[in-house]
Structure formats: structure tokens, C-alpha cells
Amino acid sequence: MTPVNICDGWEVTTVEGLGGKDTGYHPIQAAVSETGGSQCGFCSPGMVMQLHAYLEEHPEATKLEIDNILDGNICRCTGYRPILDALKQFASDATHKKLDSLVDIEDIKLCRKTGDRCHGTCANAGHCTDYVAASAAWHQPTTLQDLQQILSQFTSETKYRIVGGNTGTGVFKRDEESYDYFVNINKIPELKAESTNPMSLGGNVSITDAIAFFNRVGKSEPMWTAIARHLGWIASYGIRNQGTLAGNLMMKNAHNDFPSDIYLSMATVGATLEIVDHSGASEQVSVEDFVTKDMNRKFIKTIHLSMAKWLPPKINIGFNRVMKYPAEFIANGGHRAGASRTFCRTFKIMPRSSNAHAYVNAGFVAHVDPENNFLISGKPTVVFGGISPTFTHATKTENFLMNKNMNDHEMFKEALQTLASELEPDFDPVLASPEYRKQLAMGLFYKVK
């Protein structure tokens, strides 16, 4: 899935490099062996390396976090209990910690420039490296100007692919067959930028980094923790590490029937995309308009996440009002005075708990006033994926719900009828039946009441 050329400048550690019978086993390897966590041995290297890589980034990982990173690792003979028993010994909240008295030998060799352990990649930094092979050419720009120059050399007929994580080939395998040029954008820092004022993310930010970003801003605006939670349902931990926001959206652009969770999440919060073409000209479009946009010789530079749309009207009736909903789904609209609160909730119904596309996914956002019978202030957002390639917003339902009371049961029955009238799932032999998907979407809408 990952092209070898993307690995230029990486520090790669294999399970053999981690330890072995000749050089001595790494503590993680030893723990798996001691707890009976390996039988046939096929899954063991993946389990060991997954934890090793995670502890490199998160040395204070908890048992729950270690549990969650294994959503892409499959064991078919040993069973997960002895494996988890071994790996959770390395958690910060473990009763018995395996690494209490052990020091990683790599930490002894420090970089004189950074004071951190040496990654051995300084010599490769900052170079635009191109490769030309018999089958295809590989370009590796390091600036936006380099990228624009490369794109300007292409025509509308040129078969090229912009490469971020390249995880999309696991979904649409035929997309990889006929490209003459590959453009690796992982060396361009602007495409990995993050900002909280105003809120934005670079197009090439990984899904894992986006989750961390939304969890950080969610501490002051809890609405974003709902988005972080939804992104955590995408694929598996390893794919989220590599896959990017723009790459996922580009799959939606090329395949409108793809039930993209990035697309749904961004539509839920009203995000806009900054699109730049080969000449450097830029424009901002909504994610809904993006799916039909011609992206030839263009790329997604930035995803803008302005909160302006979701700042509630000022209602001067008190401070620090509390809604009786789970905190992870409620934000207080910029901490302004008043009782109006932003309600945000998303769903993903899938055949498995991870590594699966949605049958139906959904997102709901509304300003509600708990002091006024949960009055919906203004126009809410009601979006669905998995209905049809052209359906996103339940526009009739959104308009019907304006300035309605959520606690009015008769009103909600009318809203369900309105929603039923505009939900028309298409037939696809690969998907669940249209009838099932329609009832599922209506059930999710009812669940937020």
C-alpha cells in the first residue's frame, strides 16, 4: 500500500531490527512469548511493531489506548487475551510495568542538533528528489511552488496521482493501474499545517493527527470531540496514521458513492476547502460543492473550520447553563453568555466495529435552548452518507426544524415524515437494501431526539 519511494528519509525499524535470538529479544517480544501470546506466529510481528511504534510516540499510553490501536491486527489462532495481557504490561496505568527498569539503547545516541535521539535523516532533509523509471515518473516537491510547477507541466490528458498516504489503493484498487506520474507531497510543510485561530488543517494532515487536533480544541469547544470520535471509526489505526484528509476527500470526489466519514464530518460542521490550481490561483468551496468539482491539476491546500456558523445568538438570561446531554456532544458556542448550546452528534453504522465502510453514517448539529423547551434556534444541519451519490443534506427536514421545540413529540413525528419523503436510497447490489438504509437513517434521526 505504501510506495517504496514515499519512505525516502524515513527511519525504518523491522521486527528483526527490534530484537532476536542472536542479539536478545526486545521487552515487548519477550512479554508476548512469556504470556503465551504466540502460536503460529504470523500475527506476532505486527502486534509487537504496532505497540513499539505507538510507545515511541506515546510513552505514557494507557491500557485502553493500547487496546484501541490493535483494530487493524488480526489473530486467528492464539486469541487476543494473552496478547493483550502481554502488551498492556507496557501501559502507564498497568499494575505491573514491564519497562520500569529498561532503557531503550537507541536513546543513548543523541543528535547534536536537536538533543533528541538520532533519526539518521538530516542528510535527506529539504531536497526535491525525482525518479524516472520505465513504468512511471516519481516527483517529490518540497514547496507549494514546486508542486504548482510540476502540475503546470501536465495537461488535462496526463495520467498522474498526487500521493499522500496512498491508502486509497486499498479501497479502489483499479485506480492504481494506469498512472504515468506520481507526485509525493509529504515533504511540503504547508500541507501539514494546523491552526486554531482561525481553525484550519492542511490537506495532507493525517487522520490520526486530525483526531489529536480535534481532541485538543475540544477541551474548550467540546463539539469537536464528537468529530474526533467519528474520525476514530475510520479504517484501522495503521491506515489512520497514513491516510490524509485530502486523500479521503479526493476519493469522494472521484467516487461519489464512497461513504466518506471525512466528507460527512466536514459537511456536519460546515467546513470549506481551499483549492489551489497549477497557476497558484485559489478558491474556497464547500465540501458539498467539492464532490462535483473538476480537480485536474488542482489540490486541496487547507480545510477551514470556522466556528462562526455555529456561534449561537446571544441570549442574556444567565451564565454557565448546563445541558443534560453527554459532554462530548455539547459545546457552549464560544462561551458566550446565554443558555443556547450547540448540539453535535454523529453516527456510523457498519458491519464491524472497525475496518469497515458505513451502511449509513449521519451528522446532526443544532443550536438548542434548554431554558425554552429545547427550542432549535436557526437552521440545523442534518446530513447523511450511504443514501445515494448525490444526497447529503436533508434540506426539507432542516427547513422544517427551524425554530421548533425538540421536546414536542407531535412535531418530531412530522419531522420524521418529512425526512421519509426526501430519503430515496439508490439500489446497489453491493450495499444493504434501500429499505434497510432508509429505516436506518430515520432511526438515527429519531435517536438524537
Predicted regions and their residues:
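Membrane-interfacial loop-to-helix junctions in multi-pass transporters
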Residues: K21-Y25
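Glycine/small-residue-rich loop that forms an oxyanion/phosphate-binding "nest" at active or ligand-binding sites
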Residues: V4, T14-G19
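C-terminal structural segment of proteins
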Residues: M1, E11-T14, P27-S38, V48-K449
